[in-house]
């Protein structure tokens, strides 16, 4: 399962990107879960609060908090997430390199470019062994391996529980 966040202050754009990604993922037989955010602050707060994403599609110029500031906050918590900027503003490209973006897509997004970018990003995610992935209560989770000290498994009422300690 690839966990994706989409963040843009234009609701129409987030809808188009989400629909496009779902079509592409279906064609490539890649299961995805998407969360949509309409400002960088809520996305950064979600990541700080424990939400983990493999790929973030992020606009740069947004009203409340721009994509570069949001990415800087996200990088403090998750150094490995792939950030793909989706923007109409090429002039911010050099400024954004401080947060190590994976790719840039220019608006309006061409589905062929999106598919190529998504495929390469998914290959990068699948080649990355830096996370322990598991499902619990129908939700997919990923924990950075560097944060895991040990695993402990207990049987309570027929179910298994895995504990993570930092």
Please provide the spans of the model-predicted regions.
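Switch/coupling loops of ABC transporter nucleotide-binding domains
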Residues: 2, 32, 81
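Short, well-ordered amphipathic alpha-helices
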Residues: 15-24, 43-44, 71
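Conserved binding/recognition cores within well-folded domains
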Residues: 116-166
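Conserved SAM-binding loop
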Residues: 6, 36, 85-86
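A structural preference for long, well-packed, hydrophobic secondary-structure segments
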Residues: 3, 19, 36-42
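Conserved acidic segment of CheY-like receiver
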Residues: 2-21, 56
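CheY-like receiver
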Residues: 42-128
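Short hydrophobic/Thr-rich beta-strand motif most characteristic of the beta2 strand and flanking loop
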Residues: 25-39, 46
